[in-house]
Regions:
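Extracellular/oxidizing-compartment recognition motifs
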Residues: 40-379
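C-terminal motif of bacterial Sec signal peptides marking the signal peptidase cleavage site
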Residues: 34-37
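Sec-dependent N-terminal signal peptides
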Residues: 26-31
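Bacterial N-terminal signal peptides that target proteins for export
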Residues: 15-25
């Protein structure tokens, strides 16, 4: 990671759990961001179950946020970022009678997370996963009875956050394509309520009972782009009054299939600890042909609290590539920006430009990446 701050205190308990991009020789840059998404601190609820009957999809439509940005122009080296913002969808459902059980079948055009009464549903990450963008989307169905208010007349809030990954970003869009393959993120879902008298009601996404809009702390997110997270902003499910009427999305005309066995989960049992952590500032030995070598100011022991001053860069080397997410604790003033930059290798050879190095020896080499940048603005 890289941090070029104002002052920040970080506790060096960096861990990696199998999931995302490569080795994080974490370069943190205090103007930057950490990959968190809206899972911050919330307990995961709901139980993944078999899908509802396909016929119930007829009670729903794909909906999008009317104010969502659309990337225009040919996708190339200077125009490749996904649209900014996360699309949020919120609805309140009133129980006609006492509820015996509740299931929610959902699908997304983009990476999505769902919530019931503000609680994150499902442990899967990067839902719905990679499929042929035009032919297939995967659905996820959960038993949500335990997080529902089941009394007659009780009101429950359903919500979803959808970002462009797998749909409106570079991972599915070829070069020189006019705009992204997917124009706007979308959400679709059907709630099954089984009442205590045995009757069943299906409630789907529609234009009358749902609100939608760009909201929440995730201000940018895509598979290759990384994620920008502003912790000062409330989650979208708490911003219902700022959302507007959704619009029907007819971009996807393929088939929705239940996700069965191809889900991605966090693996805490595969936690990976850093092999070396150091803070550097300044360079020596640089020339026209060489970037030079970093000046290491201090190495950091496991468990040690790190204080970074302006101009300093912290490198956390995990010693290998991994599909993973970095985890660490930090404190800083409100408005501080923390940037976490992943890297697959370190620059070496005194930063020889002839060898394809992009910085001084000992710094993170990022030239071969598609510039993923993760981060968080502290609240």
């Amino acid at each position: 990671m890289v941090v070029n701050p104002i002052h920040a205190n970080l506790t060096n308990h960096y861990t990696m759990t199998n999931r995302f991009k490569s080795i994080f020789c974490i370069c943190m840059s205090l103007a930057g961001l950490m990959f968190v998404s809206c899972k911050s601190g919330s307990e995961v609820a709901g139980t993944k179950v078999g899908a509802l009957d396909d016929s119930v999809w007829e009670s729903s439509v794909w909906i999008s946020a009317a104010d969502a940005e659309v990337v225009e122009g040919k996708i190339n080296g200077s125009n490749w970022r996904a649209a900014d913002g996360a699309s949020w969808f919120v609805s309140e459902v009133t129980n006609d009678r006492k509820v015996k059980s509740a299931k929610w079948m959902t699908a997304g055009l983009g990476v999505y997370d769902i919530y019931v009464n503000g609680k994150l549903i499902g442990e899967e990450v990067l839902k719905p996963g990679f499929t042929h963008y035009e032919k297939t989307k995967l659905s996820f169905t959960y038993d949500i009875t335990d997080v529902m208010k089941t009394g007659a007349g009780a009101v429950n809030q359903l919500s979803a956050q959808v970002t462009p990954g797998w749909w409106g970003d570079k991972i599915v869009t070829p070069g020189n394509h006019e705009g992204m393959i997917g124009k706007k993120c979308a959400f679709r879902g059907v709630l099954e309520l089984v009442y205590s008298d045995g009757t069943v009601e299906y409630i789907g996404t529609d234009l009358e009972n749902w609100k939608a809009g760009i909201a929440g702390p995730v201000t940018h997110s895509a598979i290759f782009d990384g994620e920008f997270y502003d912790a000062r902003i409330q989650p979208g499910y708490a911003c219902g009054e700022t959302l507007g009427k959704p619009e029907v999305n007819e971009e996807f005309q393929g088939t929705i299939f239940p996700s069965e066995g191809a889900e991605v989960y966090m693996r805490p049992d595969l936690t990976l600890n850093p092999v070396k952590t150091y803070v550097w500032e300044g360079v020596y030995g640089d020339s026209e042909e060489y970037y030079g070598t970093i000046v290491v100011k201090r190495e950091v022991a496991d468990g040690q609290v790190i204080t970074l001053a302006p101009g300093e860069t912290l490198v956390v080397d995990f010693g290998q590539n991994a599909a993973a997410v970095p985890s660490f604790s930090f404190k800083a003033a409100e408005g501080t920006v923390l940037t976490c930059l992943p890297s697959e290798i370190l620059n070496d050879g005194n930063g020889a430009k002839s060898r394809g190095m992009d910085g001084p020896e000992g710094s993170c080499h990022r030239l071969n990446l598609r510039t993923p940048v993760d981060g968080m603005i502290l609240e």
